């Protein structure tokens, strides 16, 4: 069976694929965290003076931010399928302002610690997490070091968004252009239906 471009886009942008990417990022984060003891580096500049930095902190936080961003956008798409219609991602999702995105999600409440972490990710993703500077002087912010407390908050937040997506998929997700998605969490299989059934395995492990 042939699918048009809009249908292909929906299948690739369906909520389960955002979850898969988030899982991959989380796995990479765990790999890094296990090597957290590899050491620190001491930096000095005339602005900030001496700073002690973990060798994995910036990268770990960047991956954490991307993982949460994928889950947030996947959950929003699960709630608002029209955001991936007509072969385009909605302008509402073309942003790294993930706190605002998270606060727009139906049925989600965030603790102050979780909101603060999302604020950190908003600074990390476009700036010090991957570049030495942001695109505008007004966006410069102090770098944050990854800590065990941040890791615990991340894991709680990750699971919170993930559970919400799974609850929607268990009921069956109806996307645009005739695409639907049903998740069989026990078997670890996702089934995409478009006039016929297409089965594929995901990276999620069976319970």
Put a short name on every predicted segment.
Residues 49-53:
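Conserved interaction-surface patches within small, structured recognition/assembly domains
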């Amino acid at each position: 069976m042939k699918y048009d471009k809009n249908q292909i886009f929906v299948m690739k942008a369906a909520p389960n694929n955002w979850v898969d990417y988030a899982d991959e990022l989380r796995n990479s984060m765990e790999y890094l965290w296990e090597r957290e003891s590899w050491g620190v580096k001491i930096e000095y500049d005339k602005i900030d003076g001496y700073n002690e930095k973990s060798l994995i902190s910036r990268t770990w936080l960047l991956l954490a931010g991307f993982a949460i961003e994928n889950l947030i956008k996947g959950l929003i798409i699960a709630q608002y399928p029209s955001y991936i219609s007509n072969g385009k991602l909605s302008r509402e999702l073309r942003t790294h302002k993930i706190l605002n995105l998270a606060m727009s999600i139906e049925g989600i409440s965030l603790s102050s610690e979780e909101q603060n972490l999302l604020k950190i990710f908003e600074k990390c993703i476009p700036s010090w997490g991957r570049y030495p500077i942001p695109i505008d002087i007004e966006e410069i912010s102090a770098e944050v070091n990854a800590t065990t407390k941040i890791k615990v908050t991340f894991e709680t937040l990750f699971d919170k968004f993930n559970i919400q997506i799974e609850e929607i998929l268990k009921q069956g997700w109806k996307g645009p252009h005739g695409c639907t998605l049903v998740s069989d969490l026990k078997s670890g299989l996702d089934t995409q239906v478009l006039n016929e059934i297409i089965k594929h395995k995901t990276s999620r492990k069976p319970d």
